[in-house]
Amino acid sequence: MGYAQTNDLSEEDLEMFKEEVRNRINTYQMYLSFIGSKKNDNATKVVYMKQALKLFMGEGNNYRDIYDNIQPAVRTQVSSKARNTKNWIQTKNYLRNLTSLSYSEVQITQADVCYVSDFYKVRDGLYKAAMTIKQKFVGMRDGKVIYEDITEKTINVYLQQEITSVGSQYVILLGDSGVLDTY
């Protein structure tokens, strides 16, 4: 494995961060299952939405980069095998939409993390990788499956250095999530 562009972080550090990426996406998937569950009340869903958004660049809102440029809010691409379409929406709207689906029960199963790419250096203090996951969605009414699919997604992942009063540390933040395939 070559890390020519990442010479200020060791290969061991980068492997550790890749493992943390897997943990982050598992946490996000857990939040999705709570947000989509009809068993949880709206107040509980709002708590999980806020926690989920903390995993993303800008926490679901437009944000300023280190050059003080405004960057657009992170987006999630959604798809449907029934309509054979893909559309981009802001991640916070995606999460909000999960709370109001017309099914009596929604199941979003834990993602299988298929692959996390090597991190590459974007600039000082910022690295980027991509991960590929599979996610299963099941929508039911009266105990019968009305719709189900498996979606393969790619998610941008950022390793960002944050400077604090006691030094610096790297944090992992998720970025845009695109659909590769839905079946």
What are these regions (language model features)?
Residues M1-A4, V157:
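Sec-dependent N-terminal signal peptides of Gram-negative exported proteins
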Residues Y3-K50:
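Short, low-complexity N-terminal intrinsically disordered segments enriched in polar/charged residues
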Residues M30-S37, G58-N61, K136-M140:
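Short regulatory "switch" loops immediately downstream of catalytic or recognition motifs
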Residues N40, R64-D65, G143:
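Short linear functional motifs in flexible/disordered or boundary regions
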Residues K45-Q107:
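Short solvent-exposed beta->alpha transition segments
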Residues I108-Y183:
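Exposed beta-sheet edge and beta->alpha loop/turn motif
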